[in-house]
Amino acid sequence: MKIRVGVIGCLGRMGKKILNELITNTKVEIAGAVARSGSKYIDSDIGPIIANLGIKVTSSISGIFESSDVVIDFTTKECMLDCLKAAVKFKTPLVSGTTGIEGVDLKEYAAEVPILWSANMSVGVNVLLKLVKKAAELLGNEYDVEIWEMHHNLKKDSPSGTAIELGKTIANASKVDFQSNQYLHSGSNIRKKGGIGFAVSRGGGVIGDHSVMFVNSDERIELNHKAIDRTTFARGAVQAAVWLYENKREIPGLYSMQDVI
């Protein structure tokens, strides 16, 4: 029996990619697709989006959670909060890649239902996180750490969720407090010893570039990841949904792509 997957935010760039990945994955089938209330596609077949499958676009988040085995969300903080409440109500596992969610206590909801959240669903970025963690453990606090990221000119959150996750990974591995040691470059102040610096660029249609640098007076170690196509995020999200349903559907908890790979 195939896993029934619901998609929240089906008209967005990521939503469309995820729908396309779902129709090519033999383990899953599309349970339903949600768009924002007021969209001209509500009650229309998702055919114009991907393919004629006899599935209509809806604005009912609760309805999708009730009819799905697992739900994937790539939307906004406000919509994600509605998804979290619906996930708890219907005990439906949730996979989310929504960023800019400061102040949301995922652990509170994960105590009642399986939730997998990652700032970046790309397998490559999650390998980068493992490499960065190992580098930080080996190098300790003797190297300055700089994280640079670039995204398209419409991205709202800054630094990106992935950049912040990289910073937190380094802080944990180096045994320092992330909140008190992070800073975004501005003004003319000298960099803080042991600080984790962030630099941000926005322009054009860049999907996502991330670079982590460990620098001292003698050398620089640089680890990079560049996303070529958003398909990498969609494929990772579907992989995460399958993993969450097959392995943790009855085990509430907060999971990430680090668990999947």
UniProtKB/Swiss-Prot annotation:
It comes from Wolbachia pipientis wMel. The gene is dapB. (S)-2,3,4,5-tetrahydrodipicolinate binds at H152, G161, T162. It is found in: Cytoplasm. Gene3D superfamilies: Dihydrodipicolinate Reductase, domain 2 (3.30.360.10), NAD(P)-binding Rossmann-like Domain (3.40.50.720). This is 4-hydroxy-tetrahydrodipicolinate reductase. Pathway: Amino-acid biosynthesis; L-lysine biosynthesis via DAP pathway; (S)-tetrahydrodipicolinate from L-aspartate: step 4/4. Catalyzes the conversion of 4-hydroxy-tetrahydrodipicolinate (HTPA) to tetrahydrodipicolinate. Its EC number is 1.17.1.8. It holds the Pfam family DapB_N. NAD(+) binds at G9, C10, L11, G12, R13, M14, G97, T98, T99, S118, A119, N120, M121. The keyword NAD applies. GO terms for cellular component: cytoplasm. Keywords: Amino-acid biosynthesis, Cytoplasm, Diaminopimelate biosynthesis, Lysine biosynthesis, NAD, NADP, Oxidoreductase. GO terms for biological process: diaminopimelate biosynthetic process; lysine biosynthetic process via diaminopimelate. The active site is at H151 (proton donor/acceptor), K155 (proton donor). Belongs to the DapB family. It is an enzyme of class 1 (oxidoreductase).
